[in-house]
Swiss-Prot record:
InterPro entries: KsgA/Erm, rRNA_Ade_diMease-like_C, rRNA_Ade_Mease_Trfase_CS, rRNA_Ade_methylase_Trfase_N, rRNA_adenine_dimethylase, SAM-dependent_MTases_sf. This is Ribosomal RNA small subunit methyltransferase A. Specifically dimethylates two adjacent adenosines (A1518 and A1519) in the loop of a conserved hairpin near the 3'-end of 16S rRNA in the 30S particle. May play a critical role in biogenesis of 30S subunits. Its EC number is 2.1.1.182. S-adenosyl-L-methionine binds at residues 12, 14, 38, 59, 82, 107. It catalyses: adenosine(1518)/adenosine(1519) in 16S rRNA + 4 S-adenosyl-L-methionine = N(6)-dimethyladenosine(1518)/N(6)-dimethyladenosine(1519) in 16S rRNA + 4 S-adenosyl-L-homocysteine + 4 H(+). The gene is rsmA. Coiled coil: none annotated. Belongs to the class I-like SAM-binding methyltransferase superfamily. rRNA adenine N(6)-methyltransferase family. RsmA subfamily. Keywords: Cytoplasm, Methyltransferase, RNA-binding, rRNA processing, S-adenosyl-L-methionine, Transferase. It is an enzyme of class 2 (transferase). It comes from Onion yellows phytoplasma (strain OY-M). It comes from the Bacteria. SUPFAM superfamilies: S-adenosyl-L-methionine-dependent methyltransferases.
Length: 268
């Protein structure tokens, strides 16, 4: 069967069988419910299906249907649609039993990695995600303070998940070869995070990093519409240097500051 790859969907198919097997092994999906994003020609799906309890895959390119023929298996369903546009709760109600926990796996299109990550964050049924992403994005997720890659996404993802780096992947292991290298990581959700606090934390962190060249003080002043004169007493009370930038602040400090900030300024 022949298929012409489509640039608009970011199609780069992984061809290394050993790596495909390693991804599935690290995902630990035996007898679990699995979501797969972008099965493509089914190279990963063929390894997942015999091991998983049930597989629900999302493929945006319907011309790949001939490659995704799993009629001999009754534990796989493929939805030919854009994952980002789907109402996942409706899909889960239809395909899985109530209160099912899901493992996500996939080679994420580079151009929509961040929206997919935030959809994972917003979907409590997804317990963990083993994903291949652009190396540059992966290094941001793993980055620590005072590193050029450290940003709002780094802080939010590290708060929500424990992150395991599995393997860096050279571009020649794909067909067609992309212009950049990739990385495989596993995200495992940290449970028992208060939804209200999470909303506040994300709001505070995004505000802190809004403009990279600005100090934390200036960013918070602009984003929360508070004068610097109003904020300075908060900084002094909590021993925060007035010239500090967000990329110098640790995850632990962001957590503490979020709690204190919303109480201090009585912001809901």
């Amino acid at each position: 069967m022949h298929h012409t790859t489509k640039k608009k969907y970011g199609q780069n198919f992984l061809t290394d069988v050993n790596l495909l097997n390693k991804i599935v092994t690290k995902a630990s999906i035996t007898d679990k419910n699995v979501l797969e994003i972008g099965p493509g020609k089914g190279a990963l799906t063929k390894i997942i299906v015999p091991q998983a309890k049930h597989v629900l895959a999302y493929e945006i390119d319907a011309t790949l249907k001939p490659f995704l023929n799993f009629e001999n298996h009754n534990n796989v369903n493929i939805i030919y649609d854009d994952f980002l546009k789907r109402d996942l709760l409706k899909d889960f109600d239809h395909y899985f039993s109530p209160n099912s926990q899901l493992s996500l796996i996939g080679n994420l299109p580079y151009y929509i990695t961040s929206p997919i990550l935030f959809k994972i964050i917003d979907t409590p049924q997804i317990n963990d995600a083993t994903i291949m992403i652009q190396k540059e994005v992966g290094m941001r997720l793993l980055a620590q303070p005072n590193n050029k890659n450290y940003n709002a996404l780094s802080v939010i993802i590290q708060f929500l998940f424990s992150i395991e780096k599995i393997q860096e992947v050279k571009r020649h292991m794909f067909f067609p070869a992309p212009k950049v290298d990739s990385i495989v990581i596993k995200l495992t959700k940290n449970n028992n995070i208060c939804p209200t606090f999470l909303q506040q934390f994300i709001k505070f962190v995004k505000a802190s990093f809004k403009q990279k060249r600005k100090t934390l003080l200036n960013n918070l002043s602009c984003q929360f519409l508070l004068s610097k004169e109003t904020i300075i007493p908060f900084f002094l009370q909590h021993h925060i240097p007035l010239q500090i930038r967000a990329e110098q602040v640790t995850l632990e400090t962001f957590q503490k500051l979020t709690v204190k900030w919303f109480i201090f300024f009585n912001i809901s």
